[in-house]
Regions:
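Extended substrate/RNA-proximal surfaces in nucleic-acid metabolism proteins
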Residues: 2-111
């Protein structure tokens, strides 16, 4: 619905406004295939990749738990330096995993 409506606006305002269609994706490495399909299906003018969550510990079953980078629990059991390193490592892992999802991908890291 979003993409179709934006295309209608592009047509309606052609010659008056240069309307671009974009999307922001909260990056998690396990969503790579889904994001690749999405960006192939819709020819976005730009895609913003962001990091809103970082892994901070595992639960008793070994599942990775994520938290907001600004959350106190990220800093609870580690030094500031360790917490910031974890955020940067998560960002780097996403950049390595996603590279360019398509020719129009722009990665903006938001922590």
């Amino acid at each position: 619905a979003y993409f179709v409506e934006m295309q209608k606006l592009q047509e309606e305002y052609a010659g008056k406004l240069n309307i671009r269609i974009g999307i922001e994706l909260g990056l998690r490495t396990y969503l790579k295939d889904y994001y690749e399909e999405l960006t192939k299906k819709y020819p976005f003018d730009f895609v913003i990749g962001s990091v809103h969550n970082v892994p901070y510990k595992k639960d008793v079953e070994g599942n990775i738990l994520y938290t907001d980078p600004a959350a106190e629990k990220l800093f609870a059991d580690r030094t500031d330096k360790e917490a910031y390193r974890l955020m940067m490592e998560t960002t780097l892992e996403n950049v390595r995993t996603f590279g360019l999802l398509s020719n129009n991908l722009v990665i903006w890291i938001m922590l």
